[in-house]
Amino acid sequence: MSSKNSLSDKIKITFQYIMPKHAISRLVGKLAAAKMGWLTTKLISMFIKAYGINMNEAKLKKASDFDTFNNFFTRELEEGARIIDNDENTICYPVDGAISQQGDIIDGQLIQAKGFNYSVTSLLGGDEKTAAPFQGGKFSCIYLAPKDYHRIHMPMAATLREMIYVPGELFSVNPLTAQNVPDLFARNERVVAIFDTEMGELAMVLVGATIVASIETTWAGTITPPAGKDIFRWQYPKDGADAITFEKGDEMGRFKLGSTVVSTFAPNMISEFATDAGPGTVTRLGEIYAALDKSAS
């Protein structure tokens, strides 16, 4: 814990370690999935007002249109609300949010915050073979705030090869915890999706957090393995009729309540991130994030 933290920040961080994070998250998850009529509508209305959510871009625009808080939180946008960049030489932002960190994976390490790194191997579930294709590559970490659109889309065309569920803690994910909780993204519960692309391998890691009720993918629905410490893996065919393929901008998952998406890219996939992209940059789904290094393909 940084000595520069205020007393209130130190209390908040200490509370993160001692509070029953899983129990709280399960309770919130049940409430978020409950159909409570007028009370649900009231809570959604309060949430919209508190966070200044722009419902004009949502397909369903009124609080009363949603029968559960989860359905509101994972709301669909109306057609045309986000334009997906169609340049095959770029990748696009996969979510609305804000960049926490981005850069090179050096000696197997990703930057979490100043003074804190974590390993790509631990992030992807502890298997060195899974992590090997990303050694020397690049990474991006984007935080989704409560006000953001919470569906996750593909930054480029790809074919799903593997999904990994990694059990773990449920620390809150925000700038304060990123700067004070070591290995935050590699110790929280998460779902890892490994893809093949024409440029190499891509991993998208959907990181859970306190009160994140659940994580969904478009191919497997809500990920709910048995409680415990076991890591679960699912393999998928690379080709043929059963292959699961995505075009750039296709939805691949969603958070029921929000958190963070960490993406790792194989070496020589990305030539450079956009000049206006960096820690703190607000991201908008579909806009150009980085240039692909086509010279290496």
UniProtKB/Swiss-Prot annotation:
Is synthesized initially as an inactive proenzyme. Formation of the active enzyme involves a self-maturation process in which the active site pyruvoyl group is generated from an internal serine residue via an autocatalytic post-translational modification. Two non-identical subunits are generated from the proenzyme in this reaction, and the pyruvate is formed at the N-terminus of the alpha chain, which is derived from the carboxyl end of the proenzyme. It catalyses: a 1,2-diacyl-sn-glycero-3-phospho-L-serine + H(+) = a 1,2-diacyl-sn-glycero-3-phosphoethanolamine + CO2. GO terms for molecular function: phosphatidylserine decarboxylase activity. The modification Pyruvic acid (Ser) is found at S259. Transmembrane segments: none annotated. It is an enzyme of class 4 (lyase). Its main location: membrane. It comes from the Bacteria. Pfam families: PS_Dcarbxylase (PF02666). One of its GO terms (biological process) is phosphatidylethanolamine biosynthetic process. Signal peptide: none annotated. Pathway: Phospholipid metabolism; phosphatidylethanolamine biosynthesis; phosphatidylethanolamine from CDP-diacylglycerol: step 2/2. Its EC number is 4.1.1.65. The active site is at D96, H153, S259. It is found in: Cell membrane. PANTHER family: PHOSPHATIDYLSERINE DECARBOXYLASE, PHOSPHATIDYLSERINE DECARBOXYLASE PROENZYME, MITOCHONDRIAL. Belongs to the phosphatidylserine decarboxylase family. PSD-B subfamily. Prokaryotic type I sub-subfamily. This is Phosphatidylserine decarboxylase proenzyme. It comes from Colwellia psychrerythraea (strain 34H / ATCC BAA-681) (Vibrio psychroerythus). The lineage of its organism: Bacteria, Pseudomonadati, Pseudomonadota, Gammaproteobacteria, Alteromonadales. The gene is psd.
